[in-house]
């Protein structure tokens, strides 16, 4: 498959996401690229994504290794392009919150996606609003499998993800299974309803070390939004049991009255063309340092991100958080978007149909032609 690379959609510490256009079709693609020597996580993501096919999981379109004109060898992962952005984008567009009808719709879609990937023996490990995208047909699709792994009853790989969405057993470094994804669904629903992840407030920046400790070692569960109906609160309680074996499965939750008594609706997709948002769909590496003096240390940590598999999560909390920055940004803050230190890490093209002129705009700034 030949394709033309276009403008940047997102950028992380080890990979960059571009819009791209196939030469033999009108399809717009998202291409995630990384230098081969830094592409361990990306190659693992491609391997997992290539084994999945569901209306509720971002579509895999291929992968390749290619030497660029500057001599650098790149690994490219080709994926379905989601023109309506992420759940986080959707909430921001509506004043920071998603209305109840769409909360039901998107939660149902996420659970259908998880039911499918769990049936394949895969755990996502980083479910959150910025890792769920809205397709051109309005479905919520699970994306960004950079932290995903296959369930292995013998070998426990290091835990990954975003602290504010981690289940207690994950925050303690014990295990990360299907039950952990269910906890994250509850956290994502809270994010949709309130505009902020649990454990945080929209107008404050809580130390991620404190968040991780509260999640793992307190007896607390995330505060349930008071505006929710009792049915919705009961649904969240089934997701947010501190004991993993007490949480409902994706299949059980799909049969909860909160989801079954509400009609399946066609979401209203707001028309437009391009809008930018400081969130990442396909890379969990966007992270603002907790303190300015940590920036130099963070750069060194990012260079060592490939050594994450050797990290003992029973080590110092500060070290654990530093390493997690490389694979899972904490989206628990709403930073000043007018500041000069933001970079554009997500672009949306809205509208269910892509015209020729729109396609040219999306993939403008072409830099090379790839061949798959």
Curated annotation (Swiss-Prot):
User: Which biological process annotations from GO are given for this protein?
Assistant: abscisic acid-activated signaling pathway; response to abscisic acid; response to osmotic stress; signal transduction
Q: Which UniProt keywords apply?
A: Abscisic acid signaling pathway, ATP-binding, Kinase, Nucleotide-binding, Nucleus, Phosphoprotein, Serine/threonine-protein kinase, Transferase
Q: What Pfam families does the entry give?
A: Pkinase (PF00069)
Identify the SMART domains for this entry: S_TKc
PANTHER family in the cross-refs = CCR4-NOT TRANSCRIPTIONAL COMPLEX SUBUNIT CAF120-RELATED (PTHR48011), MITOGEN-ACTIVATED PROTEIN KINASE KINASE KINASE 17 (PTHR48011:SF96)
The cross-references to CDD domains, in alphabetical order and at most eight, read: STKc_MAPKKK (cd06606)
Phosphoserine found at: 312
Q: What is its main location?
A: nucleus
Enzyme class, first EC level, given as a word: transferase
What function is annotated for this protein?
Answer: Component of the abscisic acid (ABA) signaling pathway that may act as ABA signal transducer in the context of abiotic stresses. Triggers MPK7 activation in a MKK3-dependent manner. Mediates the ABA-dependent activation of the MKK3-MPK7 module.
Record protein name field: Mitogen-activated protein kinase kinase kinase 17
What compartments host this protein? Nucleus
Q: Without the gene, what phenotype results?
A: In the double mutant map3k17 map3k18, impaired MPK7 activation mediated by abscisic acid (ABA).
Could you give a GO molecular-function term held by this entry? ATP binding
EC number(s) recorded for this UniProt protein: 2.7.11.25
Q: Which segment of the chain is annotated as a signal peptide?
A: none
Give the annotated active site. 126 (proton acceptor)
